[in-house]
Amino acid sequence: MTAETQTLNFGPEWLRALSSGGSVISPPLSPALPKYKLADFRYGREEMLALYVKDNKVPSDLLDKEFLPILNDEPLLPLALVSFTEEEQRNFSMSVNSAAVLRLTNRGSSGGGGTVVGVPRGRSSSRGRGRGRGESGFYQRSFDEVESGFGRGAREMHRSQSWEERGDRRFEKPARKEPDGVRGSAWREIPDRRRRFDYDLRESKDERGYRRPRSGSGIAEDERDSLPEWCLDDAEDETGTFDSSGAFLSSKPSKKVQKEPIPEEQEIDFHPSVDGAEVSDSDGSQTEEAKETDPVQSQNQDDDLSRNDHTVQAAPSPDHKTSSPVRRTDMTLDTAHQKAVSPHLSCKMDAKSQSPSSPPTPSKHKEDAASASHQGTREKAGPCLPHPQSPALSQRSPARQPDPHIVPAMSSVPVPQLDTPTVPIHSSVCAAPGMEPVPPEPDEDGLEHLEQQAQQMVAYLQDGTLDDDHLLTKVLDQRVKGPSLDNQQKWYYKDPQGEIQGPFSNREMAEWYQAGYFPMTLLLRRVCDETFQPLGDIFKKWGRVPFSTPPTPRLGDLDPERLSRQQEITALYQMRHLHYQQLLFQQQYAVLAQQQKVALSSQQQQLPLPLQPLSMRIPEHTVIPPVVRALSVPESTSLWELPPAPTQPAVWEGSSVWDLPVEPTTQGTTREQLAQMDKVKAAKMEQERREAELRAKQEEEEQHRRKEAEEERKRREEEELARRKQEEALQRQKELALQKQMEEEERQRKKELQLLEERMRQEEERKRLEEERRRQEEERRKQLEERKRAEEERRRREEEKKREEDERRQLEEIQRKQEEAARWAREEEEAVRLLLEEARLKAEEEERNKREEAQRQKELQRQRQQQQEALRRLQLQQQQQQLAQMKLPSSSTWGQQVTPSAASQSALSLAEIQKLEEERERQKLQEQRHQQQELKALQQQQQQQQQKIPGWGTMSKPTGTTKSLLEIQQEEAGQMQKNHQQPGRNRPANISLPVAPVVNNHISSPTVGNSGSSVWGSLNNNLSPQWSSDSMSSIWGSTDVKGSSVGFWDDAVKEVAPRNATSKNKNNASKSAGSNSRQSKKVEQEEKLLRLFQGANKCQDDFTQWCEKTMHAINTAHSLDVPTFVSFLREVESPYEVHDYVCAYLGDTPEAKDFSKQFIERRTKQKTSQHRPQQDVAWVTCQTSQANSQPITLEAVQCAGRKKKKQKMVRADPSLLGFSVNASSERLNMGEIETAEDY
């Protein structure tokens, strides 16, 4: 055949584009695939599973709004890792189309015990298995593949089967090779594996061709006969065409005698179809569908049926080439191998076997047994009786043309058929309109013709009445439904591109479904329905093919309970039908032996015997219920209660079958038949001999067939039981697996929920702890600030308290000083008075001793030299004091003490006294100038020393110079107290002063005392704590009645006095006026030295004490020498530098800044008020002396005038100080301590 005949030449263009290029019935021997090429990269199942990544994100191409309704964020697991659902297991166990057809036709599998006829086994056995071919297939197990002892064990279904093994395309959309084709909806699908071919990629090239499936019997000849002749190997030279329905019409006459119609059938116009199972579907569904789709032609149903017998007589339904959006090659192959054998065949065999003149041949017996066994297997939806036809209808049928709508409808449902070589089979569905069947071969003998006639009569008598009932019921239904039902029953469906196609009639939909174009996922609806539903759901609800003729309810009208009840009743009637068939066969076989022995005269009495089942006919008013319309069995008839077949002929109202009331056309037909049978009698008598020889063999084969039928029935019952058990086990297993999966999912969900709750609780706990910690830190910070504020407040209160205490103490000190000054003033006045009195007495005594003055002049000269020596020592002592930065104010003149001079001094003249005074003034001036120079030099040395020693703040605290000097003074005072218990009284009485000098000294003495009391009183309080009152009392002593006082520098006088006394004792001479002048010089030198000490100790005033106290409070974390730092700060003039030094050494704190500020203010006040008290003291002294109305000498005036002048450096005697600070010749101010023993 040419390539043009292999492609679809009808149907929509898009459907022809999806065609794989082969025939609907079966693919060509070698697939022609010019449009596809192999993928560059091909992967196996394990490789694809290894490539699966669970965490893959959704591609950006699918995030468009267009895909949001169908987009799933989480990727699906590979199906190999997912267990079967109940629906998948059922679908994989049997093809959905095949299962539906089997349920509709009440048939299981063929009697061979293999696969369902037409279902390919193995991989790559059919084309269209690849993706993108627009075809779909399901894995199918044959009915007898259950676990029984007769057939092969059931094949267990696993996910390990590849898509190619399963042929499952339900979850995929067909992809196109063109770039603009619709892509699949699964985003995780690998595009390289999307377009695969229908054959295995691992097969060799010679294995890729078309492979014919095995039949149940495994006989190659059966396989060959099950195929249409145009696709056989020996039909290469045949040519033919396809009619409008897609059926193949051969242009040459068939060579097989068995596949030609009987010429006598044409003569009597009674043509029972060999494919009667297709025509007489369970309840005449094709006829009913034809009536529904064409109500006008349903009025002439009798003519249509007779004409259908002409056109359909041997056509297998798969030859219809109709277009549909989705092709199913499985169904194509399935229907290609199915050959329908109607119950007419069995009835013909029975009638033929009853004929005495035609003994059955072995092949005919086998045919009868096979037909019986085949009828016993139609359990799913099954029609058991053939479609009725009356003789009148068969006579009128040649006068009418067949209805083109009825022809395909009558073969719309495929039925598994028995492969028998003796049954006439045509390869086409129906002949072209107007074509006559091919004439029979001339070698066909009359015996075969008579047998066919007998079979036709038996079929007519058995089924005539039942089919009349069906026709009457359908006509009534048609009248009730009205002409509008045709449009309401039309179908719409959505093609893979999402476009709605339709409307189409039931006939067209049934043809496309039968050809395998519709998958179970196809969305369709009728005109009367509102929504689209998948084809699989409609199958479940209706329990049959929705395109069949019986009136279908609206989608959703059938409830599950009613459906299950219908299925149970259907199964019951199937079992009853099996039993009825077995009884019928037994009766026929029993009568067969008697027919061969009876003479021709008894032929009419024997004819009713095979018609014995007619006793079970029901009244005409019986209506078949809608639940069992597909059974063609009366509801009120119990097949189990059928009476056993009598051995004698059963007689009804008439004496024979010819007495039945029939129409005139029927009586004419029977007369012709009787005439023909008379002619046959002679021929059968000639063949009695041959039949007698075959009789024994026939009986033996009959018994064998009975046994086989019984065994087949038992086997099928066992298979059914095993299948049910297996299904129940699978169902239980699925339920358990589903329950486990649900439990696991529930546990997983609970676990995830617990984890989520735990995570949320931890998060809340962490937030709470964080909040608590933050609150605690805030409270801690507030408490710290509160403590700091309280500490500052406490410190401020303490400072305020200290300040108030200092002010109070200062006031008390001022009062005490004032009282002390007043007391000292009184004491000084008393001392002056006593001194004046004593001076008067001494003056008188001096007058008496004037004569002795001349004698003691020499001694006086010697004393003067000693006094000069003491003065030098005093100057050395002043140098040492200057090193300690001790200065005495120039106004302090209290250190001057009045030394009683000798009586001989009074004898001096006034000129001498004046000369002595001038000389003393000149010496004082020189000493002052020398002292100033030394002070300047000492200051320069101290400045250089301070510059040379950096980091004085970190040096260890040096011992205060005042403290060491105090210790020395205390030691000296102790020695003086031991040596001179009464220093005032031990003085020599013969020493007297001249009158004038005495008055001068006495007048100046109160001034000095008053000034000293005010100065040293303040020193008592302002010096460091070493200067206690006890030490002062022991050092400074107290004034006696005579006016002599033990002062700080009285030791020099004490040393001089004993020496003078010793010299006086040795020389027994009185003191001269020169000794008086020396004494006055010594007093002045001591006064200067005291001024130095007063200047040094003045640093320990209130300001210094405040500085040290405040710095001790601040300097808690610093190792700082406070006195040294205070003395250093006092020398810093710039306030900014003071602030920088304080912040550098005490820290940049508010306390340090406050201290620097107060330090600058207090120092400014102290400097401004430093000079005024000294001047006030000097003026107070002068006023006090004036109040006493004492004459002021020139010396007092000169001393008062020199107070404002800068004093000269006074050298201190090392013997008085106890140490020497003489600088070495090489280095300045680097001396060594010298003790008193060194002199």
UniProtKB/Swiss-Prot annotation:
Similarity field: Belongs to the GIGYF family.
The protein, known as: GRB10-interacting GYF protein 2
Listed Basic and acidic residues bias regions: 153-181, 257-272, 318-331, 678-737, 843-862, 914-933
PROSITE patterns, alphabetized: GYF
GO cellular component: a single term: vesicle
InterPro entries, per the entry: GRB10-interact_GYF, GYF, GYF-like_dom_sf
GO BP terms, alphabetized: insulin-like growth factor receptor signaling pathway
Biological role stated in the UniProt entry: Key component of the 4EHP-GYF2 complex, a multiprotein complex that acts as a repressor of translation initiation. In association with EIF4E2, assists ribosome-associated quality control (RQC) by sequestering the mRNA cap, blocking ribosome initiation and decreasing the translational load on problematic messages.
Domain GYF positions: 488-536
Polar residues bias locations: 241-252, 888-900
Organism for this UniProt entry: Xenopus laevis
Biased composition annotated in UniProt, kind: Low complexity: 863-885, 901-913, 934-948, 1060-1077
Taxonomic lineage: Eukaryota, Metazoa, Chordata, Craniata, Vertebrata
Subunit structure: Component of the 4EHP-GYF2 complex.
Region Disordered, annotated ranges: 105-184, 206-409, 678-749, 763-812, 843-960, 1057-1085
Composition bias type Acidic residues, residue spans: 231-240
